């Protein structure tokens, strides 16, 4: 089972490696300004805010996650059309649809894996790390081979299509989703032995599994105050994360003139993420580090990373900055995933992760990319890095202020 999850994660992240670093590039290849690219990104981010919540609720309720993976892969091909067409309107539409599909997969996959692995953060960390390995391998191959050509949209879209095809195949071999801690094939057996096998955990207490709660489409009572506080603070930090996730590729290719080798720097960041996912997952599972600690360190890491870009605009400095991806993304993601598994009932895992991705990641990144495009056009990248570094610094201070509440 774990091996099939690893395969799924490998090709999922390989698909993202063909889309995420190259999206800004194929839009710039079409002659669009930074401001227009920021607006297109913002439209896509709107889709990635709304649709993950909807589709993840469907996944939670139906457990038809493998079918949903396939549908999301097909919809993500909209990036191909967005890159190749000559209509600005069609570019907006296709970018919207493709963003809705691609950025639904991650939160859906997180909730799905939490159910299949019963919240085991060590195994989850391994599975996610293999996904990161797929991301790294893909970008290293790109950087060394020169494929895809970052100046050719046809080359970029060929890579996107191949990667999504491999992910679709891997999803067909993924394990069946679990229904409240069991596989679908075991559900009937569990129901027959329900009274004997029930354990008094938060996820299957009468209150958590009561029928009235299930009938609601959504209820704020499903999540405690700590969940909402931490989402709010992460929101602030993730506005600045948009620089790394959405606007760094053009900086590396146009300002530092790295050409196709820019993907090697992105791969280096992903490699450091790989290490954090493995080590951090094991430390979390053994209780040697609190999820709050990793989440807090992520804000500090992002602050330092942006300041490095601002004051040391060299390739060597960017190498060090890329390694901080282990903190500003990996530490946050694995820490928050564990935090959610500890504070959210199992039946709401996917929804909780979709709220993290949609409301605390994609929405603030929408704001960040929209404003950032205008900042780059008007003032340049140095001002962007300096101004955005303030946000994770504020988040770090807030994490310290709410330490007792969030660790309690």
Put a short name on every predicted segment.
Residues 50-63, 146-147, 276-290, 376-377:
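Helix-to-loop junctions at the C-terminal end of transmembrane segments
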Residues 1-48, 226-265, 333:
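Helix-loop boundary and gating motifs at the non-cytosolic
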Residues 66-80, 293-308:
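Structural signature of the two symmetry-related core transmembrane helices
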Residues 348-378:
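A late C-terminal transmembrane helix in Major Facilitator Superfamily
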Residues 96-130:
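Cytoplasmic helix-loop-helix junction between adjacent transmembrane helices
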Residues 10, 88-106, 235, 317-331:
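Hydrophobic core of transmembrane alpha-helices in multi-pass small-molecule transporters
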Residues 174-232:
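Juxtamembrane intracellular "pre-TM" segments in multi-pass secondary transporters
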Residues 155-172, 384-402:
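Symmetry-related core transmembrane helices of the 12-TM Major Facilitator Superfamily/SLC fold
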